[in-house]
Every structure is written in C-alpha cells, then in structure tokens.
Amino acid sequence: MWFKNLQLHRLPAPWAVTADRMEKWLAPHAFQPGSSVEMQRVGWASPRDDGALVYSINRQMLLVFRAEKKLLPASVVNQVTKARALELEEQQGFKVGRKQLRELKEQVTDELLPRAFSIRRDTRVWIDTANGWLVIDAAAQALADDVRSLLVKSIDGLPLAGVQVARSPVAAMTDWLLSGDAPGGFTVDQDAELRSSGEGGATVRYVGHALEANDMRRHIEAGKQCMRLAMTWDDRISFVLTPSLTIKRVTPLDVIKEAADPTAQNDDERFDSDFTLMTGELARMLTSLVDILGGDRQDSVPQPAAA
C-alpha cells in the first residue's frame, strides 16, 4: 500500500473537486489494451479492480496510471535488419543506402511487433484535495513526466504547480549534516551523498555509516554539498531527501505498522484503513518538511469552480 517514492506537486488547498467529477474526467482516457502493432499504450486503470477509475475516502483520492509496452529489444531488430540488408545487397548487387536501410528497419519492426511480449506497469497517484497535494509514486523522472502528461490531458484546467520552498534543500541538507541534526522532529540517518560543484564533480557516499561531524565539515569546507540525505520523521517514517524535493525510499516504521486497524474484516476495510493511515501520516510529514525548509512559497493557484 505505501508509496515508495514521492514526486510532489501542489494543488489549491482545498481543491473543490469530487470523485464523481474526477471519474468523468478520467473515463475518456481509461486504459485499453494496445493493438498488435502498437509499441506502447497508456491510460487510467481501476485502483481496486472494480471498474471505478477513482478510489476516494476522506477527501483523499487514488488513481492508477497504466502503461503497456512491447518488449522488442533494439538488438533483435538490428540483427534481423542486418541479415535482410545482406540478402538485399546480394539481390541488387550494390550496398544498401541509408534511406533504404531505414525503411528496412521500419519494416522489420512492424513484422516483429505482433510477436513481441507485452509488459504492463502501474504507477499510483495520490491526490489530497484537503491539503492540496498531488503525489506520484515514481522514482524515475521520465515516468513521472508521462503520468503528468496524461493528468494534464485528462483533467480540465488542472491547477498543478511545483513545490516552491523558501530554502534550498541542498543548502538545508548541508547545514543539517554540519550540525548532525535537523529541526522539526526530523533526524539525520546514516546515508548521505556529498558532491563537489567543481569540475569533475567529486562525490562521496555514505551508506549505513555514522556521519561524523568532523568528516562532514572537512568535505563541506572542501566545497562539497549534500545531494542526498537519509532522514526519519517523528520516529514514524524514514526516507531519502533529494535536491528536487523528490522523496525516495519511503518506509513506514514499526510504530505505524502497529497502528493498522485490527478490526478490519475484509480486504475492502483493510484497504480503506491502510490508505487512510498512509495519507494521514504522509500529509503530516509533508507539512513538517515544508515548514523546516522555510515554508511554501507557491503563489495562490487559481481554483476551478466546484464540480
């Protein structure tokens, strides 16, 4: 249930959009399996496999972006194309030109696509309409871009914005390393990456290692800055902070795992409970994180009329 990565975006808080309105926006872009000759197909899928494209509880929504892609390695296409080109050269008595080779490669690709295996990958999107967050569970920026692209295409006038904080995450993480601690209920853990901004970009990584203040000071005085820092919030959630405010390796700790509702009687009730717990904890953590970075500088975003 828990998101592993948090690509953060801002919405108006509150955002007056209902689950029914969201469902109508997404429906024209529902996922449909690709044809035998399509390389890739994307769309919205049901989070609970019940036909609904939006799962909603307590003003929190869950969406699922589904991508289907044909597995057709370039090496296979190139190998078959090369063999076809040799055959063609023998037939016509001269070397295949660039244009002819390109056309041959396209022909080979079209022939192989129907026989290629397909793989589907789902990416979850959490929308907190109460607190104005839209969060994509994606580690790779390219995947997050694909999800955002479909969101913008699907949702009329989506008032989406980046998170703008008063203090640079790099400057803040570097200062926290120097002091060995972070404010606001956050603690510094034992993973960090420091990188020089100079030529060559000399990099030092610590993994599961005590971050001694003297070592950190030596690296920072040499011109390095902290580019990744493992942290824990309120002894409840551990994560890795990055310069772009993308949060990675999100892990709920024991105190949260023990808070799971023991009275849930079935899968639906457990899902409701787990999603409510996750969104509540993450919303509180994100508020605290923005606070220790000087607050949210995002200008007020125009809000669409309530649906």
UniProtKB/Swiss-Prot annotation:
It comes from the Bacteria. Pfam families: RdgC. It is found in: Cytoplasm, Nucleoid. One of its GO terms (biological process) is DNA recombination. GO terms for cellular component: bacterial nucleoid; cytoplasm. One of its GO terms (molecular function) is double-stranded DNA binding. Keywords: Cytoplasm, DNA recombination. May be involved in recombination. Belongs to the RdgC family. This is Recombination-associated protein RdgC. It comes from Burkholderia cenocepacia (strain ATCC BAA-245 / DSM 16553 / LMG 16656 / NCTC 13227 / J2315 / CF5610) (Burkholderia cepacia (strain J2315)). The lineage of its organism: Bacteria, Pseudomonadati, Pseudomonadota, Betaproteobacteria, Burkholderiales.
